[in-house]
């Protein structure tokens, strides 16, 4: 099975401009993401998908591969769709979408989503990762997206609010979403062509579009948390984690 991992990266960010190039222990964040991903087994190719020449230069500077995408991409999925069209992938090729703000992603977590497609061919069109929340401060933080899933590990909903809500107890597991997606090239193209979903627009979560239009999302639960970098403070958290790893 041909497996291409794409890391969408854009320079502009309202909260953290230039985030992909922010240094973490002397290396740009995008390099940490790329090098972590390269340790995952089963990948055919890895590319950074960007529209920014500064990011392109940084990636090529450490020996990584880049595909330049349109600056008009309205979303991460549109950027991924643009990239796979340029790369000429086949309909049944597997695409891994690893968010470029995951510098501490564990390579085995990437292998988990690949394994879902290998073990359950044809049963679903999209897969992603979850992690049981340990840090209680994340429970009500809208930057940490929560998720619920059924007994077969198919997603029921994703939200910036705490879900599920325990009416009579607070002692129950809550899972957060980690920024890794897997799908076939054919599904990416179909997904990108769908109109914006009502719930997607409310929560500002693209994965809800898939659920709103009746597509199944399989969930793998990772044993490893991953810090999502949204602010300069998150960079410091990453450096602290790396110091003890």
Swiss-Prot record:
Pathway(s): Bacterial outer membrane biogenesis; lipopolysaccharide biosynthesis
An annotated GO cellular component: cytosol
One GO biological process term: lipopolysaccharide biosynthetic process
Entry-linked SUPFAM superfamilies: Nucleotide-diphospho-sugar transferases
Cited InterPro entries: Cytidylyl_trans, KdsB, Nucleotide-diphossugar_trans
EC number assigned by the record: 2.7.7.90
GO molecular function: 3-deoxy-manno-octulosonate cytidylyltransferase activity
Designated gene of the protein: kdsB
Function: Activates KDO8N (a required 8-carbon sugar) for incorporation into bacterial lipopolysaccharide in the Shewanella genus.
Subcellular location: Cytoplasm
Organism: Shewanella baltica (strain OS195)
The protein, known as: 8-amino-3,8-dideoxy-manno-octulosonate cytidylyltransferase
CDD domains: CMP-KDO-Synthetase
Principal place of residence: cytoplasm
